[in-house]
Amino acid sequence: MSGTRAGGTADVGLIIAVKRLAAAKTRLGPVFSTRTRENVVLAMLVDTLTAAAPVSALRSITVITPDEAAAAAAAEFGAEILADPTPDGHGDPLNNAIAAAEHAIAGSFSNIVVLQGDLPALQTQELSEAIAAARHHQRSFVADRLGSGTAALCTFGTALNPQFGPDSSAQHRRSGAIELTGPWPGLRCDVDTPADLAAARRLGIGAATTRVVAHL
């Protein structure tokens, strides 16, 4: 399925990398069974895509994943689905997946945004504003709410050079990316831990995640 949408002013390709659901968000294990945790991860992806899809700057959405359920959910939004070629045991699987997606779409897009797929409180306007701010720089990023991680990495006319992983905010800053300083609380609230999920719920989470965590 093609992830390219019509729109004369849309000039950005969005990439979301999603790992296999069974291996994702293990730090949520203390509050969820394995099956529920997988459902939470999938629901957060759906809510992220629900917020991102209406952003007028986006010409395409590409989801790279080895997971069939995640791929099927993303396809419902018209996303281009790429099978993650990263082998098991790879030392840097997230950045490798992002680089593979960048290579796949770089021939069509010189402007690319990488977005985390675990942003259940994301608002469409936040992502629109962040992309507008990113246009003033060749390469920029949005830190997470704790200031240590990265919620989004944006490039306009240059390579992504993704540095996701531990202390990715500092890594992106050291690599020359400009930190974007807008408030955007939902964009900054990625969910890795029960505390992150509580913070997202205080902001207001999307319908898919709400259905899964309603019993908490």
UniProtKB/Swiss-Prot annotation:
It catalyses: phosphoenolpyruvate + GTP + H(+) = enolpyruvoyl-2-diphospho-5'-guanosine + diphosphate. GO terms for biological process: F420-0 metabolic process. Guanylyltransferase that catalyzes the activation of phosphoenolpyruvate (PEP) as enolpyruvoyl-2-diphospho-5'-guanosine, via the condensation of PEP with GTP. It is involved in the biosynthesis of coenzyme F420, a hydride carrier cofactor. Its EC number is 2.7.7.105. Disulfide bonds: none annotated. Phosphoenolpyruvate binds at residues 150, 165, 168. GO terms for molecular function: GTP binding; phospholactate guanylyltransferase activity. NCBIfam families: F420_cofC. The lineage of its organism: Bacteria, Bacillati, Actinomycetota, Actinomycetes, Mycobacteriales. The keyword Transferase applies. It is an enzyme of class 2 (transferase). Belongs to the CofC family. Pathway: Cofactor biosynthesis; coenzyme F420 biosynthesis. Keywords: GTP-binding, Nucleotide-binding, Nucleotidyltransferase, Transferase. HAMAP family: CofC (MF_02114). Gene3D superfamilies: Spore Coat Polysaccharide Biosynthesis Protein SpsA, Chain A. This is Phosphoenolpyruvate guanylyltransferase. Pfam families: CofC (PF01983). InterPro entries: CofC (IPR002835), Nucleotide-diphossugar_trans (IPR029044).
